[in-house]
Amino acid sequence: MNVITGRVWKFGDNIDTDLIIPARYLNTSDPHELAKHVMEDADPEFPSKVRPGDIIVAGYNFGSGSSREHAPIALKAAGVAAVIAKSFARIFYRNSFNMGLPIFELLESDEINEGDLIKIDLDNGIIHNVDTGKDYKFTPIPEFMQELIAAGGLINFAKEMLKENK
């Protein structure tokens, strides 16, 4: 069973790419440098307190704004294991999978609280809130998208495919 388990960081609606990684830090593409500033304009303590495996839960329109790949790169480098939101900007959705960051749409995201421990069952499409005992259903990620995540993103996936075809 393919499961992601982590503690929740809670954010609201319309978290755009400038809040995820402010434009003033786009002079680098080093993931570790970006991670030092991820979400700092939304929560100044986030970069120092986020831990590997943590999960962001947000409202509508997560990742709107400019189509920078820096946003999912920064989240992933900071240790964020997944993002759950009511909806995502389409370009952020695609960029996240291309970078190997799993994201999930869940209209009931406001029922999950900051600090809750949740388990995301990728195979069965279930988010289980360990603290409340409540389960939420989502449409499972297509197999190809799961392969992108498992490979660490589109570039790594393509490299693996090239190795297999030699």
UniProtKB/Swiss-Prot annotation:
Q: Does the keyword Lyase apply?
A: yes
Its keywords, alphabetically, are: Amino-acid biosynthesis, Branched-chain amino acid biosynthesis, Leucine biosynthesis, Lyase
Q: What class of enzyme is it?
A: lyase
Please give the InterPro entries that the UniProt record associates with this protein. Answer: Aconitase/3IPM_dehydase_swvl, AconitaseA/IPMdHydase_ssu_swvl, IPMI_Swivel, LeuD, LeuD/DmdB_bac, LeuD_type2/HacB/DmdB
Q: What domain of life?
A: Bacteria
Q: Name one Pfam family in it.
A: Aconitase_C
Q: Which reaction does it catalyse?
A: (2R,3S)-3-isopropylmalate = (2S)-2-isopropylmalate
**Protein EC:** 4.2.1.33
Q: Which GO terms describe its biological process?
A: L-leucine biosynthetic process
A GO molecular function held by the record: 3-isopropylmalate dehydratase activity
Q: Read off the SUPFAM superfamilies from this record.
A: LeuD/IlvD-like
Which pathway is this protein engaged in?
Amino-acid biosynthesis; L-leucine biosynthesis; L-leucine from 3-methyl-2-oxobutanoate: step 2/4
Q: How does it assemble?
A: Heterodimer of LeuC and LeuD.
User: Which family does the similarity line name?
Assistant: Belongs to the LeuD family. LeuD type 2 subfamily.
| Biological role stated in the UniProt entry | Catalyzes the isomerization between 2-isopropylmalate and 3-isopropylmalate, via the formation of 2-isopropylmaleate.
Query: What is the designated name of this protein?
Result: 3-isopropylmalate dehydratase small subunit
Organism expressing this protein natively: Nautilia profundicola (strain ATCC BAA-1463 / DSM 18972 / AmH)
